[in-house]
């Protein structure tokens, strides 16, 4: 028997405890973390989840995510790894790529996909790194108008997103009166700005994008067109909203929103023949594959998260089923039912409705704002988020609430259920107005929260609504792992 390296005999009891630690279930090994997870599980079970970017992953996805694939390091790409022992990791990644192309009906001769991005933000930054030189120019929908931080957000005084720090960003806007994207203004600004990349993507925009118009603007300016379909990727897979693939050079996405997978990202890119010279017949081919793959690894990331790639692969298989397509149709139907119910209760919904999974409710006509309403609704077990509305003067006091239907649709809610949800929201906003009247319209959010927490009459009203909400929510099963 070889002597221990440290010259001391191994403590058999200590080593036995080590082996026990490795085999213990979470509830025995770390009761603090276990209890936090249980509390969060209960919050999800008894509450109404209306955050548009959230969903409930299936048991199969979560099982893949918690598998032994977490243990394996595999820098590089299939067949070109920097580590040994990657035979099955290669098999998994190739399967995930194949399913990603299949779910969107893409020809592998014309499209490729990178499934290694850790999430949507790194995926977007990898595209910019690949296609836009440092300090090159990009155009994305402004964050206050429904865009995303990673599309180049900055204020008059500060560059907020890393995208705006390392690249020159000019946002495009919506029409403040209609809430629709102002494509004419975008076209004029692009002619003056000469972007290298135009981003067709949103985080709070309830209408379909005009990809054909965006592609024409890109072509007129020699720019690439990239779609960030993170919010609508599941809807695109089911064919219930227009696909960006017909018009875009590159498409990025997360995998955990409407696609209902785990948290990860994907980048699709065109390949093959880009154009043919009509005089000589000479072909020009896309070179996006090497640029994007190099930007992901080794440019911005190290080893891929193989457990997440497994979860994505499972979600992609589920997304090719008839039941998934039925689910996505119901997401849109539920969103329209929610919009109609709220408008019937006197609320203004930006753009007057929705083509997808979310709506933006403008509370200015009610005399309050999204921050206050969000806090009261949260106290009533309704989760949503404050959001700027077109024409808002300050992002610090946004006027709107963003509401989405994917998560609750996964729990089985239908149109009539969302009508009831709308009435819960209405009662929560009425409570918001009562508290605001008591504390004063000019009070800070902190003062508003102190009033919410300190006044007995408000406590009773919130508790009564919360009890009704939780009684209603628990009628619907929560997907996921048993025991959590």
UniProtKB/Swiss-Prot annotation:
Any idea where this protein resides? Cytoplasm
**CDD domains to which the protein is assigned, alphabetical:** SHMT
Similarity-based family: Belongs to the SHMT family.
Q: What is its EC number?
A: 2.1.2.1
Anything else known: In eukaryotes there are two forms of the enzymes: a cytosolic one and a mitochondrial one.
- The answer to keyword Transferase applying to this record is yes
**Keyword Cytoplasm found:** yes
Protein's name in the database = Serine hydroxymethyltransferase, cytosolic
> What Gene Ontology molecular function terms does this protein carry?
glycine hydroxymethyltransferase activity; pyridoxal phosphate binding
**Ranges in coiled-coil conformation:** none
Q: Organism source for this protein?
A: Bos taurus
Tell me which Gene Ontology terms the entry assigns under biological process.
Answer: glycine biosynthetic process from serine; glycine metabolic process; L-serine metabolic process; protein homotetramerization; tetrahydrofolate interconversion; tetrahydrofolate metabolic process
Residues modified as N6-(pyridoxal phosphate)lysine are 257
Task: Quote the function comment for this protein.
Answer: Interconversion of serine and glycine.
- Which co-factors does it depend on? pyridoxal 5'-phosphate
Q: Which GO terms describe its cellular component?
A: cytoplasm; cytosol; mitochondrion; nucleus
Quote the subunit structure annotation.
Answer: Homotetramer. Identified in complex with ABRAXAS2 and the other subunits of the BRISC complex, at least composed of ABRAXAS2, BRCC3/BRCC36, BABAM2 and BABAM1/NBA1.
Pathway given in the UniProt record? One-carbon metabolism; tetrahydrofolate interconversion
Q: What class of enzyme is it?
A: transferase
Which UniProt key words apply to this protein? Answer: Acetylation, Cytoplasm, One-carbon metabolism, Pyridoxal phosphate, Transferase
Q: Which residues carry this modification: N-acetylalanine?
A: 2
Q: What is the lineage of its organism?
A: Eukaryota, Metazoa, Chordata, Craniata, Vertebrata
Q: Kindly state which reaction or reactions the protein catalyses.
A: (6R)-5,10-methylene-5,6,7,8-tetrahydrofolate + glycine + H2O = (6S)-5,6,7,8-tetrahydrofolate + L-serine
Q: Entry's InterPro entries? A: PyrdxlP-dep_Trfase, PyrdxlP-dep_Trfase_major, PyrdxlP-dep_Trfase_small, Ser_HO-MeTrfase, Ser_HO-MeTrfase-like, Ser_HO-MeTrfase_PLP_BS, SHMT-like_dom
């Amino acid at each position: 028997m070889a002597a221990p390296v440290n010259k001391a005999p191994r403590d058999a009891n200590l080593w036995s405890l080590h082996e026990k630690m490795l085999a213990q279930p979470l509830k025995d090994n770390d009761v603090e973390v276990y209890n936090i997870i249980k509390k969060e599980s209960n919050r999800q079970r008894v509450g109404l989840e209306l955050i548009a970017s959230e969903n409930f992953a299936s048991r199969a996805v979560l099982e893949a995510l918690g598998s032994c694939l977490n243990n394996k390091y595999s820098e590089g790409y299939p067949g070109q790894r920097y580590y040994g022992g990657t035979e099955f990791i290669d098999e998994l990644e190739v399967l995930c790529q194949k399913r990603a192309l299949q779910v969107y009906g893409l020809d592998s001769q014309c499209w490729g996909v990178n499934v290694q991005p850790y999430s949507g933000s790194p995926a977007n930054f990898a595209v910019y790194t690949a296609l836009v030189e440092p300090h090159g120019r990009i155009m994305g929908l402004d964050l206050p108008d429904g865009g995303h931080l990673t599309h180049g957000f900055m204020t008059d005084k500060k560059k907020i997103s890393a995208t705006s720090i390392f690249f020159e960003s000019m946002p495009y806007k919506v029409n403040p009166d209609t809430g629709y994207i102002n494509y004419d203004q975008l076209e004029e600004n692009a002619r003056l700005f000469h972007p290298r990349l135009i981003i067709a993507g949103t985080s709070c925009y309830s209408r379909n994008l005009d990809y054909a118009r965006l592609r024409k603007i890109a072509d007129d300016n020699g720019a690439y067109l990239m779609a960030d379909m993170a919010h609508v990727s599941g809807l695109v897979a089911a064919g219930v909203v227009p696909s960006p693939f017909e018009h875009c050079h590159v498409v990025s996405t997360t995998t955990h929103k409407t696609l209902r997978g785990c948290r990860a990202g994907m980048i699709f890119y065109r390949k093959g023949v880009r154009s043919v010279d009509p005089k000589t017949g000479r072909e020009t081919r896309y070179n996006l594959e090497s640029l994007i793959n190099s930007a992901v690894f080794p440019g911005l990331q190290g080893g891929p998260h193989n457990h997440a790639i497994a979860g994505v692969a499972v979600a992609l298989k589920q997304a090719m089923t008839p039941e998934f397509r039925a689910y996505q149709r119901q997401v849109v139907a539920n969103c329209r039912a929610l919009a109609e119910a709220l408008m019937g209760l006197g609320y203004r919904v930006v753009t007057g409705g929705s083509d997808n999974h979310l709506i933006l409710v403008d509370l200015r006509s009610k005399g309050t704002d999204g921050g206050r309403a969000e806090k009261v609704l949260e106290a009533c077990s309704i989760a949503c988020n404050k959001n700027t509305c077109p024409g808002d003067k300050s992002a610090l006091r946004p006027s709107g609430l963003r509401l989405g239907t994917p998560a609750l649709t996964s729990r089985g809610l239908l149109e009539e259920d969302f009508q009831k949800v709308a009435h819960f929201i209405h009662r929560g906003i009425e409570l918001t107005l009562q508290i605001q009247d008591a504390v004063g319209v000019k009070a800070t959010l902190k003062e508003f929260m102190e009033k919410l927490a300190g006044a007995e009459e408000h406590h009773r009203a919130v508790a009564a609504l919360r009890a009704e909400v939780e009684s209603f929510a628990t009628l619907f099963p929560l997907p996921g792992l048993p025991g959590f």
